[in-house]
Amino acid sequence: MSKLNAYFGEYGGQFVPQILVPALDQLEQEFIKAQADESFKQEFKELLQEYAGRPTALTKTRNIVKNTRTKLYLKREDLLHGGAHKTNQVLGQALLAKRMGKKEIIAETGAGQHGVATALACALLDLKCRVYMGAKDVERQSPNVFRMKLMGAEVIPVHSGSATLKDACNEALRDWSANYSKAHYLLGTAAGPHPFPTIVREFQRMIGEETKQQMLAKEGRLPDAVIACVGGGSNAIGMFADFIDEKNVKLIGVEPAGKGIETGEHGAPLKHGKTGIFFGMKAPLMQNSDGQIEESYSISAGLDFPSVGPQHAHLLAICRAKYASATDDEALDAFKLLCKKEGIIPALESSHALAHALKLAYEDPNKEQLLVVNLSGRGDKDIFTVHDILKEKGEI
């Protein structure tokens, strides 16, 4: 029986109740078979093209870095059906679930983007869908909650713990433990127990593959750096995967620094956490001196996650990728700038990556460089949040 690597260096693994091991083994075997099955790959490719709208554009910005010698491109995952990169891997996993004969899908969601993507895939492929969502997130992401319901999903608010994403993850795993024979747990990021980090990466890697081809066509060379925001890390690993062996391309992940790293109110476990076991994996984790999980914080619900995917931890450990952070205010400034200068409303998550790219462009305006930001999602879901913050600041 062929097996995938369960670890990335020391990170990853499969720390789950014994009852779930057969379900994870089945998932791994079916994934390996599906990857070797031309008809599965063809169906996935067709859904991505005909339904989701791939390939997405690689847009050269016109105005935002005008006074520098930086060329800044945006990989437009915001243009994907569903509004974010999430749709890619959800279609892949939903097809995999059908292949395994599962009729129900369980998912968790933070910002609601993964929930919406799961709901649309389930509607399309005729699967029953239930989504766990922290009660706090249900409040702050009401448009996405309604979208999920419109597409036939059952949305279950989670009131335990901090009533955010980590609690929704725990409830979803609990449900799966009870129902794995008929339900597939459609995990929303490149984290969690093996084989999820690998499956999600492979179902997102077209982001980097397309970027590479588009870049060569437009500029005749690869970029100096690709930059992506990191919560759990799926959009970033999708962008990085095809560039890992291209040693001249810097991989830069941007974690949320929230109100500032020094305040403790952030979501940057890669640089400021300690290794622990959470959500079925060994990974960097925000924890206090007693080893209890600390609350993560970010202006963007989708980055508000106290851990990170194991491959990112490994890429940092071997110095292949670099991880920076951007504060709420920096992300907000980048958000406003992209709206005003380019006519694109980005997700607050993606705005963290953009903020770091702008920092690179402006700290040395005379440096010639070619940068790509993965614009992982559109900002429609965030306009009410931004409106309230700007109102509070007296800017509108």
Swiss-Prot record:
InterPro entries: Trp_synth_b_CS, Trp_synth_beta, Trp_synth_beta/beta-like, TrpB-like_PALP, TrpB-like_PALP_sf. Its cofactor is pyridoxal 5'-phosphate. PROSITE patterns: TRP_SYNTHASE_BETA (PS00168). Its EC number is 4.2.1.20. It catalyses: (1S,2R)-1-C-(indol-3-yl)glycerol 3-phosphate + L-serine = D-glyceraldehyde 3-phosphate + L-tryptophan + H2O. SUPFAM superfamilies: Tryptophan synthase beta subunit-like PLP-dependent enzymes. Gene3D superfamilies: 3.40.50.1100. The beta subunit is responsible for the synthesis of L-tryptophan from indole and L-serine. This is Tryptophan synthase beta chain. It comes from Francisella tularensis subsp. tularensis (strain WY96-3418). The gene is trpB.
